[in-house]
Design a protein with these regions (language model features):
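Pepsin/retropepsin-fold aspartyl endopeptidases
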Residues: 7-155
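Short acidic, low-complexity intrinsically disordered linear motifs used
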Residues: 1-7
Length: 155
């Protein structure tokens, strides 16, 4: 009986049930960096969510990156090769800790990019599933407080 209870109580063994609705823009907190405006992209099937940073230096299995003057050193987990308009953008993947909707998520894979994008932090489908939310494309900041755009180019 104990094995059955242990099996059922693990999230991975349960059918996905998303009864929380989020907006397509929400506030997400990246551990060590702070709050950021995130776009929940249901069409993003890449291996990692995308985060636009200022500098990236990959040497061996170590990634040194910088965003708004804050410096980070992370272990390289792999490389994402998303294609957009037939252009391939190589993004080193690192793991970060993220807080969303008062829940703390460890080892969230993010692909770092220095190319300017319409969104500073683009959440992929895997992370949306991990957040256990339905995304309403007509609403913003349903589960979190409003946060301004990082720059004038943000959507």
């Amino acid at each position: 009986m104990k094995e059955l209870f242990d099996y059922i109580t693990q999230d991975i063994h349960r059918k996905h049930s998303f009864n929380k609705e989020s907006g397509f823009h929400e506030r997400v907190v990246i551990d060590g960096y702070g709050p950021i405006r995130a776009k929940f992209d249901t069409g993003n099937g890449t291996h990692a969510s995308m985060f636009v940073v200022d500098k990236i230096d990959v040497s061996g299995k170590t990634v040194k990156w910088e965003k708004d003057g804050k410096k980070f050193t992370s272990k390289l987990q792999g490389t994402s090769h998303p294609t957009h308009n037939e252009k391939i953008d190589e993004r080193p993947i690192v793991l970060v800790n993220v807080t969303f909707n008062n829940k703390f998520y460890t080892d969230v894979p993010i692909g770092l990019s220095i190319k300017d994008s319409k969104s500073t932090f683009l959440v992929n489908r895997d992370l949306i599933t991990r957040f256990k939310v339905n995304v309403n494309p007509n609403r913003k900041f349903v589960l979190s407080k409003w946060i301004e755009r990082s720059d004038g180019n943000d959507a």
